[in-house]
Amino acid sequence: MEQARDHLHLRWTTEQHMPEVEVQVKYRTAALSNQECQLYLRHSQQQQVLVVDFQAKLRQVFITETPRCGKKPYWNNEEAESKQNPGSIYCLLLLIRGGMSDSLIKREISNFEIVSKNKKN
């Protein structure tokens, strides 16, 4: 009962202090001691978390695509660019610059990780 009251209070205060257009309350579920707890975040806070995760993922993908042989990476190679065959990092950055949605960015990063793992095997 107390949890439900807290939830209603949080929702009411968020809606009171912010214009309806800006209110994009999303929740994520965290498992704590075998109990599910919903954490409600403002859009700006959630975006901040996404950026941190995204930067870590991008760094990880970048490392897996950097060759260790001393040659220029193919995604930063003029010859590759002239053949219009840039690497996945370059493509991903273009998609982000083009206004790709957060969910699509996450999906694309997952696809790159799968491809990178398959290349190693």
UniProtKB/Swiss-Prot annotation:
One Pfam family this sequence matches: SNURF
Residues annotated as signal peptide: none
Single GO cellular component term: nuclear speck
Family of the protein in this entry: Belongs to the SNURF family.
Cited PANTHER family: SNRPN UPSTREAM READING FRAME PROTEIN, SNURF (PTHR14508), SNRPN UPSTREAM READING FRAME PROTEIN-RELATED (PTHR14508:SF2)
The protein's name: Putative SNURF-like protein
Name of encoding gene: SNURFL
